[in-house]
Amino acid sequence: MKHINDYFWAKKTEENSRLLWLPLTQHLEDTKNIAGLLWEHWLSEGQKVLIENSINVKSNIENQGKRLAQFLGAVHDIGKATPAFQTQKGYANSVDLDIQLLEKLERAGFSGISSLQLASPKKSHHSIAGQYLLSHYGVDEDIATIIGGHHGRPVDDLDGLNSQKSYPSNYYQDEKKDSLVYQKWKSNQEAFLNWALTETGFNSVSQLPKIKQPAQVILSGLLIMSDWIASNEHFFPLLSLDETDVKNKSQRIETGFKKWKKSNLWQPETFVDLVTLYQERFGFSPRNFQLILSQTIEKTTNPGIVILEAPMGIGKTEAALAVSEQLSSKKGCSGLFFGLPTQATSNGIFKRIEQWTENIKGNNSDHFSIQLVHGKAALNTDFIELLKGNTINMDDSENGSIFVNEWFSGRKTSALDDFVVGTVDQFLMVALKQKHLALRHLGFSKKVIVIDEVHAYDAYMSQYLLEAIRWMGAYGVPVIILSATLPAQQREKLIKSYMAGMGVKWRDIENIDQIKIDAYPLITYNDGPDIHQVKMFEKQEQKNIYIHRLPEEQLFDIVKEGLDNGGVVGIIVNTVRKSQELARNFSDIFGDDMVDLLHSNFIATERIRKEKDLLQEIGKKAIRPPKKIIIGTQVLEQSLDIDFDVLISDLAPMDLLIQRIGRLHRHKIKRPQKHEVARFYVLGTFEEFDFDEGTRLVYGDYLLARTQYFLPDKIRLPDDISPLVQKVYNSDLTITFPKPELHKKYLDAKIEHDDKIKNKETKAKSYRIANPVLKKSRVRTNSLIGWLKNLHPNDSEEKAYAQVRDIEDTVEVIALKKISDGYGLFIENKDISQNITDPIIAKKVAQNTLRLPMSLSKAYNIDQTINELERYNNSHLSQWQNSSWLKGSLGIIFDKNNEFILNGFKLLYDEKYGVTIERLDKNESV
């Protein structure tokens, strides 16, 4: 290929008047080499086995998986060997560089290229051109489509590919096949293909293997990753224009890869003694439940999905981490994803996962990289500390072994890191049609997946969850589901999706009618095509919770009674507005110091501080206040390890009520005598189903009615958890109300509930990827053509989160306060406006985000809200565009009264109560 190095370019730029370029062959060689090194040093054993087993061998060539990965790297930019690409003007260079590179081509015999004016060069993007050329030269669709999609999106259909025939000049400069220049382009393109084949051990196109679709996705992701690394000029520098070749090619690849590679591949130990495993990892011996689980998994041959249903506080997290090591060893995984419902729960577990990661390293000199992935990860102090240490000397193990690799910190690459903690959205997006989706599949297919706090997922989110699990089944990736309150039909759907991904037909599975049992605790798992359940455990200590239905007008009396002679009273309600109203009322009566409030409408830094304060007050081993009222929304039920002496809650679906009950008498501590019996009060139960409007909007009448119907006067934990959840969510269990009008109201609510589910499922399917193709059929081809058709229109991470959760659009701003003639943070009385371009100050400011109330982001007014904010920022905060931390953000400055007028509303921020909103024309709260 030496002769081709002289004239085709892959990259070009200009730095300090130096004209730089990278010959196409050098970039292809770099990418091929990176693909080979990633195969050897980054891919998990399980991924390699998947690819090798997906190959339909056409020859006796060894290591066909690795060779195919390298071939893709070697040929991926063949579409750049076309006039359409070579005549492109550079984005970061003078015209002089463009001219000189075209002159190289002229001297090489491509006469007229300097003056060529193509009619439609953009119709033949080099990725599509690459697929078209490979197909033209005999490469099968399954491999050629990977090349066509290496910029993040495969072609939607063959029509788009076939249309390339209409642009012969884009490929050959001339439309006449017998012209010299046409033949010269053709012979050079063939030379690139033949070089790629020879370099990777294939004698001809006919020797290239056929490969199944799931493995195509992994190879596609691997190619994109290889290309991105090889395109990084810090790793692989460009050459001066007068250079045509790299002097020391082996040194170039070795140096470049070492600059990128900072962590070692995790190779899990094989433990025979499970007690030792727990002691070394967590510092304690396993409980009966944990030991039985690990012993069960140890006996399996080909495990896949494991569902753990057990009460709160039994140690499911440690059980999952121990089992993830066992599954990694059995299935050849080399990483972990731990997903939780919210940013707060992800933050809460990050330190524990980091410590486990440190412990699995043991006394080795291994270095492991870990990521915290959600919208507010930069606020997590533990993650920030790791970020500060990410420039450690990797040869010096004294400097720490768990760190953050910056290359994996981008939103497209974070899923590729070995150990990732984040919100469950990250996993749900495996099923969302998004550009560069193959990268996310590449990252998740090398890990054990743990999804914590899986309850009765919304029907919309379930579409993405079940599809993502189906793809994990196709990849043979272990999935661990943790839940305290899982409806039986949800358990069945999870298992069914995974088995379908494996290619196992549901009707062929024995004893499937047993899957919906209500035993508790319960382990459900597969071993190859068989499903098993474990329900025999050591009898657990029972805790009695007494349930009282509480009329709203008696709330004050119960709270006062709970405080008399000492006690911590918790109140969990379903809306922010109600929590604020209650907090104000009780503060007026009992004093500000007696009442704490937590919900999602605080400035982000304030919410995190409030969560920490709460854990210090009523968390494990906390020094508890003699008396306290703590009011909050659903954030209090989500993994905060807190303990109330008495708990009051709005009515909610049964599984969520039980989650809330999990915060009542959670720890074994000495309590005031009158609180020795656990009492749980439920607000908002109505015989006529006249539920609170805010609660109805959140949960719907149907589940509220069924929960109210089956809610007993006493719950025995943990024995009653599963039976109660199954009763509410088992729609086959019919209930009848004596009053005909009430029964009709219930049936109407059921119809509305069922319609809502159907609509949500239909809506979710719009941007959800299709099932993996395990076998070619007349309906579905064995390739990636059309895989991302109807791509989600917005590529931002925030929009993707909203899409997989079906969240209404919200507007987030950075909240500041007017100080003197400038502005500052609410927590500091200091004007920082003149130093806003200081990176330290800008980063601190960027952390103070606030989600505006929904009244400002309705379909009819969200555009106006954003337009007003943009005008305000252009006028008052234009300096932010000069800061990498603040560029693109929207800020608001509350006045001296903590007020801000926006789109016909007055916002008021209070450090105790959060943000509230009033409509200006009616002067009433919204």
Curated annotation (Swiss-Prot):
Q: Which SMART domains match?
A: DEXDc (SM00487), HELICc (SM00490)
Give the note describing cofactor binding and stoichiometry.
Mn(2+) or Mg(2+) or Ca(2+). ATPase and nuclease activities are dependent on divalent cations, for ATPase Mn(2+) is marginally preferred over Mg(2+) or Ca(2+).
Q: Where, by residue number, does Mg(2+) bind? A: 77, 150
What are the EC numbers?
Answer: 3.1.-.-, 3.6.4.-
State a single Pfam family of this protein: DEAD
Stored InterPro entries: Cas3-like_dom, Cas3_C, CRISPR-assoc_Cas3_HD, CRISPR-assoc_Cas3_HD_sf, DEAD/DEAH_box_helicase_dom, DEAD_box_RNA_helicases, Helicase_ATP-bd, Helicase_C-like
HD Cas3-type domain: residues covered: 17-229
Give the result of residue 452 to A, as annotated.
Loss of ssDNA-dependent ATPase, loss of helicase activity
Q: Which PANTHER family match?
A: CRISPR-ASSOCIATED ENDONUCLEASE_HELICASE CAS3, DEAD-BOX ATP-DEPENDENT RNA HELICASE 47, MITOCHONDRIAL
Q: What is known of its domains?
A: Proteins of this family have an N-terminal nuclease domain and a C-terminal helicase/ATPase domain. In some CRISPR/Cas systems the domains are swapped, in others they are encoded separately.
User: What is this protein's record name?
Assistant: CRISPR-associated nuclease/helicase Cas3
What organism is the protein native to? Streptococcus thermophilus
Encoding gene (name):
cas3
